[in-house]
């Protein structure tokens, strides 16, 4: 009989839990929580993601099927749909956002020496957004059009390893240019983006390659100093 650790527990061992605990403390995630801690919440959702669960009911049924083994997987609290739904609704999302950023930074280090087909030593990023449709009756706060709900996912992808280095979720109506105000540019890096991000008021400090069809007016030419 196998007496070793479950594969899930072995995977979770690689997580920087000291950063997670720090985030929980910073945002008081476990304040007045008695049974289902932030750690339980994260482990349940991580398990759901890794095993392709599709609903809260699916998560509940799957985890309850291995109820005697949950302790060895690190899950101490009782798992139910209502508990998961309440945690998803009430818990401070910044706990998991900060932890996700720490995981992303760890993953990027694993691919930092990976060669690009373009033979560039500098970091190359791809910036884009995608609109995710939502059922308006279930998500009334995400109104996009009269009878349609949506949110927009803005992603900055590090092409070494194809790892997202920056992620923002906004209202579906938010213009793509919004993300340029959120980004902290990396010196010497290349950013690949489509024409939706063309805005001279934001990009005048950058060297960029534009489309031949672009229409612009030069209001003033400055002589090079020195």
Where are the regions that the model predicts?
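Conserved, well-structured functional cores that handle cations and Mg-NTP chemistry
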Residues: 1-226
